[in-house]
Regions:
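Phosphate-coordination/substrate-recognition cap region in phosphate-metabolizing enzymes
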Residues: 51
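Acidic, glycine-rich loop-and-strand cores that form catalytic or ligand-binding grooves
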Residues: 71-79
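Active-site neighborhoods of divalent-metal-dependent phosphate/nucleic-acid chemistry enzymes
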Residues: 80-149
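Alpha-helix capping/helix-boundary segments
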Residues: 11, 48, 126, 149-150
Length: 154
């Protein structure tokens, strides 16, 4: 399998784009083209979908909110259909996932230590989801993000 990257909310909001959260949209589109040309594949972690969906729900203009929601829905449908460059990653939200999250996945720091260092639970969920993907697939995966705290673990 070619390189795989988990897409953080900061990038997904620019890909959709979500009004007010798309300040890097041109840069993201340009980088997406470069990554696609290299054969990179992408996974949308649950956290990114939920957070982006919440940001869309906060768009004040109803028509723009609908158009933006339709764009995110189109991306999610491509994932459901297994269409490249998207990879569907099945992950269970269960006791094992929560325990791994609390242990900090493969970061060698607990959730509490991450929180103290300003790495949120959402970011740690992405790290944990990536950990499970790598364990199951034996494919090293990165995280594409603009978030400095998360980038330290990308």
């Amino acid at each position: 399998m070619s390189r795989v990257s988990f897409i953080d909310t900061t990038v997904l909001c620019n890909l959709v784009p979500v009004p007010g959260r798309d300040q890097n949209a041109d840069e993201v589109r340009r980088e997406m083209k470069e990554r696609l040309a290299r054969g990179e594949r992408f996974i949308l972690p649950i956290t990114s979908v939920v957070e982006t969906g919440n940001f869309i729900a906060q768009v004040s203009d109803g028509q723009l909110r609908r158009q933006t929601a339709e764009k995110l829905a189109a991306i999610l449908n491509l994932i459901c259909e297994g269409k490249a460059p998207w990879v569907l990653h099945d992950v269970a939200w269960d006791r094992a996932f929560l325990k791994t999250l609390l242990d900090g996945a493969d970061t060698m720091s607990s959730y509490v230590e991450h929180a103290v260092n300003k790495v949120g639970a959402g970011d740690l969920c992405i790290i944990t989801e990536r950990f499970y993907f790598q364990e199951r697939s034996s494919v090293r995966a990165g995280i594409w993000t603009f978030d400095a705290g998360l980038r330290a673990h990308a």
